[in-house]
Amino acid sequence: HVVLYRSFGWEESMPYFAHLPLVLKPDGNGKLSKRDGDRLGFPVFPLEWTDPVSHETSRGYNDYGFLPEAFINMLALLGWNPGHDKELMDLEELISLFSIERIGKSGAKFDWEKAKWFNHQYLQAMSTEQLALCMQADLEKNGVKADPAYVKKVCGLVRERAFLIPDLWANSWFLFRAPEKYDEQAVKKVWSPETPALIRSFAGEAASVTVWTQDHIHTLVQDFVTRNGIRTGQLMTPLRILVVGSTQGPGMMEIAELIGKEEFLSRVKSGLDRLARI
């Protein structure tokens, strides 16, 4: 750039130039490229980009579910340091602290897990109302119409598991619709000939309760397992599979309260009927 300015005789109006350090591959061997992103499973462009020659489309950070402010924060700290250990800074603070003198001379290794950590921190700082707005696109894509107040409750329940925006849906879809299939390996591991009768007995008792809150459900479960001389997991793990489809997810008491008693019992009955046919 300097040579171009000089060749055109524009030296008097030439701005000061400074080169930021290269962003290196995660192992530090060479500069980061699109090929590295494709190979290692992360984006290298801020937005979706289509190669004009190959017509190959690459998803960007925006498409992966990064918040703009998290992306900027992460990128600013590649090759530059603010002079202290604080990592989370908004754009205004980054601008106020920036100085050429603190730009490093060596390349900066890109860390995908660290990039997701930044996004996770920003997601945790958002209100449930803001998270619900972030989740709206995934709800629409999956044909889900839900009460905004319910969506906010869902976001509050799964927010700690979300590192990228799509994680909100990935960790909560079962709070909007019943599972259509069940984790076969999980079923084989916890199911026994006595399990269906045990579950039906608990469901019968659950159907008779009038108050359906986490505390009341917890008391119901503890009373049941004590009277039947079983471990809590012998009841709760099969119930989780029937209600969620797998052994993953937030606490079962929280799930049960959120989806409501009728939906809970409906899923239990439907799941038992389906598994009986397998």
List the model feature ranges, each with a label.
Residues H1-F8:
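Short active-site loop/helix that positions an aromatic residue
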Residues A186-V243, Q248:
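C-terminal accessory/binding modules appended to enzymatic or scaffolding proteins
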Residues F8-E11, Y16-Y182, V244-I278:
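Catalytic adenosine-cofactor/nucleotide-binding cores of aminoacyl-tRNA synthetases and other
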Residues H1, F71, M135, L220-V221:
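Generic structural signal for hydrophobic residues
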